[in-house]
Amino acid sequence: GRMITPTDLPALTPDITTLYFGGISLCNIPAADTYLALAERETSKCVIMLDPNIRPGFITDEAAYRTRLSAIFAVADIIKVSDEDLEWLIPGTADIMSKLAQLQAGRQAVMILTCGKDGARALLPDGTDVAVSVPPAVVVDTVGAGDTFNAGVLAHLHSEQSLTKAAIRQLRGAHMTKALEFGAKVAAVTVARAGANPPWRHEISDA
């Protein structure tokens, strides 16, 4: 909940290897500062994925929010933004991949960009740029699509023994392409259903 504080945080057990942060949980204190503290506390041990999923209507203090995002960007291993997120983070006329590279600058992070029906791209730590298209889908409800995409990417990396801090820094284009494709595939199932209703793995072909 939004009232969680650092004293509420438990010690993480060794089997927890990845933490995912995002959405409106980063907008309001004390929860937002608590989640930032957790990311900073665990960054040496866990893979950190961030999807800010920026919702300007929920932001009550833009300066503080931008500062908080910068701090969690600094400890994240995988940063996923939408084209709309990126335009909010880096306003201006530069092309979208230049903005993604600007956001990545100085970090050893995998940057993922989702562009709705135009697919998804990733910029790897070595500068490799990969892109995938979105599989055909009958859109019923887009609620949960982004979270499902992110879960699919993480699940695929985990299945390939690539969900470690060292492995992420050494990801190759072919491996990232497969992860993006799996994320897009599971998200396509979610949008074809009413509500936030992601698929089970056995529902996904070639999983």
Residue locations for each model-derived region?
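Conserved phosphate-binding/catalytic region of the ribokinase-like
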Residues: 92-207
